[in-house]
Regions:
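C-terminal regulatory/effector modules of DNA-binding transcriptional regulators
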Residues: 142, 147-263
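A short acidic, leucine-rich amphipathic alpha-helix
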Residues: 26-30
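Short amphipathic alpha-helical interaction segments
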Residues: 32-44
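Basic, amphipathic "hinge/linker" alpha-helix immediately C-terminal to the N-terminal HTH DNA-binding motif
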Residues: 53-75
């Protein structure tokens, strides 16, 4: 890796070759680097086993493909952490698995929504806007905000597909505030499911086909309502779906018969 990291030209060549074999003059046109610099570094890459010559073109070897993929992924992770360093520094990340953290590069380019003195409800308003425009939604709520059951209720009544996971201690409150009849209708109609976990949840997650939002708890144990990470990139949405699915696998479903008896 040191051989690659020490030269931006070599990395640029490998990136250009990710899309398939190229001649040196093709790399020259794409990169605007000097022909001699490209030629010299391409041959060094060949000597190290990262690139091979096929007829008059050059292509990545398996080794080159593996290394440049890892290197670009690592750079995205560093970019993700650096761009929002305070978000990752002073929050509880115990809700994320090692595998989730290994794939933080998926959040590269995310926007950090912050409340400020001019708009102390900025994150909440952004959350509401995203909810209202959703066509389907998967949500993990770690706490009961008075507005969120109302948002869920409206979506259910509009026939929007909603999958909800909450902790057991706020389950009753969510059902009460959404409305027993609406919950029952959503479950019967197949556009609403609600599951619960017996332990505390340390992440707020909302995912649709078009966005993902991530909220975390501060190190003092309180939920940070002033910062929200937002992305509309497919790889970020996929990252969030993986997390949701892992929680969903461990959550207990609301059994309709039991629900009717209790409520």
């Amino acid at each position: 890796m040191k051989f690659l990291n020490n030269s931006d030209i070599r990395i640029r060549v490998l990136v250009d070759l990710l899309n398939g074999p190229l001649k040196i003059r093709d790399i020259n046109k794409k990169s605007l680097l000097s022909y001699s610099s490209i030629s010299s570094n391409v041959h060094k890459l060949c000597d190290e086993g990262y690139v091979e010559k096929i007829h008059n073109s050059f292509q990545l070897t398996n080794l080159g493909l593996i290394y440049i993929t890892i290197l670009l992924d690592f750079r995205d992770v560093i970019s993700t952490i650096t761009d929002n360093s305070d978000f990752w520094l002073d929050h509880d990340i115990s809700s994320l698995s090692i595998d989730d953290l290994n794939k933080l590069s998926s959040l590269e380019g995310s926007e950090l929504i912050r409340c400020n003195s001019m708009d102390i409800y900025k994150t909440h308003k952004e959350f509401k806007r995203l909810f209202k425009n959703s066509r389907n939604l998967k949500v993990i709520f770690p706490y009961l905000h008075p507005e969120y059951p109302k948002l869920i209720r409206r979506l259910i009544l509009k026939g929007i597909k909603v999958d909800l996971i909450v902790s057991r201690d706020i389950l009753d409150g969510f059902i009460r505030d959404i409305g027993k009849d609406v919950v029952k209708k959503g479950i019967y109609d197949g556009n609403f499911s609600i599951k619960y976990l017996s332990h505390d949840i340390k992440i707020a997650l909302a995912i649709s086909n078009e966005f993902i939002t991530v909220g975390l708890f501060k190190l003092d144990g309180t939920y940070d309502q002033n910062r929200l990470l937002l992305s509309n990139k497919k790889k970020a949405i996929s990252w969030g779906l993986t997390i949701f699915d892992s929680y969903d696998d461990n959550a207990l479903p609301l059994i309709l018969d039991w629900f009717l008896d209790i409520f």
